[in-house]
Amino acid sequence: MQADTPKGCFVAVVGPSGAGKDTIMDAARVALSGDMRFHFVRRIITRTQMPGTEDHDSLDEADFARAAGEGRFALHWQAHGLRYGLPKTLDDEIAGGAVVIANVSRRVLSDIRRLYTSRSVVVISARTEVLAQRLASRGRESREEIAARLAREVGFDDGSGDVVTIDNSGEVGASTKAFLHHLHEIAVKTIA
């Protein structure tokens, strides 16, 4: 192994709104608590904490721009009128041998593939009718907005060979089990 080869792995979790990414990641975080091989990244978002949303750190636009300019993010992007960032410290976790798991936008997959040689892209998906039902139950968007959102959804597998898809249309426990199985496989392969 070369000295500059990371010991750990970056696991990028992507998928459409309503697929259950946060639910599965939260369950996996609980199941893996205390296992130092795994590190779940807490995102930084230009949105204050609200009930029913992911647990994250908040920055206003000016502070976020300053942090980005100072290189404090490993990755950052803009989506749905908000800015998102992952702290630069995740690189230290990977260098130290951890499997680092983060919910990201498909917009940064090319950056992830360029920056992280040891990586896996996990697509959490669900059937369109399931996504529509879940989005409607949140009560944040009109029926028309949900239809427009679903019409914009695109595939995540671009043939790069690093994609694992988990269909979360059914029981979330089965999807979480599949996600945990994948994470354990990565840990066995990447951590000596």
UniProtKB/Swiss-Prot annotation:
One of the GO biological process terms: organic phosphonate metabolic process
Annotated source species: Brucella melitensis biotype 2 (strain ATCC 23457)
Protein name: Ribose 1,5-bisphosphate phosphokinase PhnN
Substrates-to-products reaction catalysed: alpha-D-ribose 1,5-bisphosphate + ATP = 5-phospho-alpha-D-ribose 1-diphosphate + ADP
Record's function text: Catalyzes the phosphorylation of ribose 1,5-bisphosphate to 5-phospho-D-ribosyl alpha-1-diphosphate (PRPP).
Pathway recorded for this protein: Metabolic intermediate biosynthesis; 5-phospho-alpha-D-ribose 1-diphosphate biosynthesis; 5-phospho-alpha-D-ribose 1-diphosphate from D-ribose 5-phosphate (route II): step 3/3
GO (cellular component) term, any one: cytosol
Family recorded in the similarity comment: Belongs to the ribose 1,5-bisphosphokinase family.
EC number: 2.7.4.23
Keyword annotations from UniProtKB, A to Z: ATP-binding, Nucleotide-binding, Transferase
